[in-house]
Design a protein with these regions (language model features):
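C-terminal lobe and adjacent flexible extensions of AdoMet/dcAdoMet transferase-like proteins
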Residues: 221-261
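SAM-dependent methyltransferase
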Residues: 152-225
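A short acidic, Gly/Pro-enriched loop at the edge of an enzyme's catalytic core
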Residues: 108-119
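Class I SAM-dependent methyltransferase SAM/SAH-binding core
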Residues: 60-105
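Conserved class I S-adenosyl-L-methionine
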Residues: 1-52
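A short glycine-rich, Lys/Arg-flanked "PGG" loop and its adjoining helix->strand segment in the class I
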Residues: 135-147
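Conserved SAM/SAH-binding loop
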Residues: 55
Length: 261
C-alpha cells in the first residue's frame, strides 16, 4: 500500500469520509443511469462487486434496487460507516462489506456462493500504485464474475481532460473543513502529484489540520480500455456522465461500460 493511500484512507479517514459524504446526494441518479445500462445489456437483477467501495454509496443504492452487494475497501473506518449507512437505508441484510486490498481481491472475497453479475469501480479509484496492480485487480474481478457480467468504471479523471482543462490550484469546503489542492501533472508520464492541505474552520479563522501528498497515475481512454481487454473485459460504451448517459468528451469525466469477454 502506498504511504499516501494509507495516510488518506486509513490514518486520516475522518477527513476523507467528510469528502465522500459530499457525493452521496448525487448517487441515486448515478445508480439510475447504471440500471438503465444494465437493462439495455439484459441484466435486471443479481449481485454486485463494488471495488474500493468507500463508505458504501454504490453498494447501498444498488441494494435498494434489489441487488445483493459486496463492497471491498482497505479502510476499516469507511466500512464501519458503510455498515451504519446500510442499516439506515434498511439494506443491511443484502449488503456485505469486506476489509482488504483489491490487489488481493480473490483472497478478500473468498469463494462466493455465485459469481457476480456487475462490478463497479467509482470515482477515480485506479492508478494508485502501478499498471500491473490495476491489471491484477481487474483480472481477479473478471474471474469472480459471470460470462455476461458488466463492469462500470465511473466518475474517473483521464488524460484527455487534463490536457485541456488542467487547474493547478483550487479549493473546496465541506462541513467545517477547507481543502486546498495544489496540482502538478506530467503529460509524458501521465503522473499527477497533488497536495491536499486541510484546514478546520473556526469562525473566520482557519487552522491547519493536515497535509497529504498524492502520487497518482492518470489513464487515457485508450490505455484503460487496453488494460481492461488484457484483464478479460471488452469496453462496449463510454459516457461523459453515467447519470444522464451524456456522451464522453475531453471535457467530461471518464465513464466506461465493459462486458466480460
Amino acid at each position: 500500500m502506498s504511504d499516501w493511500v494509507n495516510k488518506l484512507f486509513v490514518e486520516r479517514s475522518d477527513l476523507f469520509l467528510k469528502l465522500m459524504d459530499q457525493r452521496w446526494p448525487r448517487t441515486e441518479e448515478l445508480v439510475n443511469g447504471m440500471m438503465k445500462v444494465l437493462r439495455d445489456n439484459g441484466v435486471y437483477s443479481g449481485s454486485l462487486l463494488d471495488l474500493c467501495c468507500g463508505n458504501g454509496r454504490i453498494s447501498i443504492f444498488m441494494a435498494k434496487k434489489g441487488f445483493k452487494a459486496t463492497g471491498v475497501d482497505i479502510s476499516k473506518a469507511f466500512l464501519e460507516d458503510a455498515r451504519r449507512k446500510a442499516e439506515e437505508h434498511d439494506v443491511s441484510s443484502t449488503v456485505t462489506f469486506l476489509e482488504g486490498d483489491v490487489r488481493n481481491l480473490k483472497e478478500v472475497v473468498g469463494s462466493p456462493s455465485q459469481l457476480f453479475d456487475v462490478v463497479s469501480n467509482i470515482w477515480t479509484s485506479i492508478g494508485f500504485s502501478s499498471y500491473e496492480d490495476d491489471l491484477k485487480a481487474f483480472k481477479q474481478a473478471r474471474e469472480l464474475s459471470k460470462k455476461s457480467a458488466i463492469l462500470f468504471i465511473a466518475e474517473t479523471m483521464h488524460t484527455e481532460y487534463l490536457s485541456i482543462k488542467f487547474t493547478p490550484t483550487s479549493y473546496s469546503e465541506f462541513d467545517n473543513i477547507v481543502m486546498l489542492e495544489n496540482r502538478k501533472y506530467d503529460p509524458i508520464t501521465s503522473q499527477a502529484n497533488t497536495s491536499w492541505i486541510f484546514y478546520s474552520k473556526h469562525g473566520k479563522n482557519l487552522e491547519f489540520t493536515d497535509k497529504v501528498e498524492i502520487q497518482h497515475h492518470i489513464y487515457s481512454l485508450s490505455e484503460l480500455t487496453s488494460l481492461l481487454r488484457k484483464a478479460g473485459w471488452e469496453t462496449v460504451a463510454t459516457y461523459g456522465n453515467l447519470a444522464t448517459l451524456q456522451p464522453m468528451s475531453p471535457l467530461t469525466s471518464l465513464n466506461i461500460v465493459a462486458r466480460a469477454r
